[in-house]
Swiss-Prot record:
SUPFAM superfamilies: Ribosomal protein S18. The gene is rpsR. It comes from Petrotoga mobilis (strain DSM 10674 / SJ95). The keyword RNA-binding applies. This is Small ribosomal subunit protein bS18. Disulfide bonds: none annotated. Binds as a heterodimer with protein bS6 to the central domain of the 16S rRNA, where it helps stabilize the platform of the 30S subunit. InterPro entries: Ribosomal_bS18, Ribosomal_bS18_CS, Ribosomal_bS18_sf. The lineage of its organism: Bacteria, Thermotogati, Thermotogota, Thermotogae, Petrotogales.
Length: 76
């Protein structure tokens, strides 16, 4: 019987940890759009590769930007 090597999934590294980001500004709309899909929903961390700490920071920044009407709420 032939030996079949299992493929390992590549672990995504957090881009924000690599760049030593300590704060995500809610006024930086271009940066926030990277973590949202085309309908305006926040992408989960398993898709965008954020760690838990930075995913919370992204979530609060997007929520603040939505309240200030800088980023639209979810579009249908």
């Amino acid at each position: 019987m032939a030996y079949v090597k299992k493929e390992r999934k590549r672990i995504k590294k957090c881009k924000l940890c690599r760049d030593n980001v300590e704060y995500i500004d809610y006024k930086d709309v271009r940066k926030l759009k990277e973590f949202m899909n085309d309908k305006g929903k926040i992408l989960p961390k398993r898709i965008n590769g954020n760690c838990a700490k930075h995913q919370r920071m992204v979530r609060t920044a997007i929520q603040r930007a939505r309240k200030m009407m800088l980023v639209p709420y979810v579009n249908e």
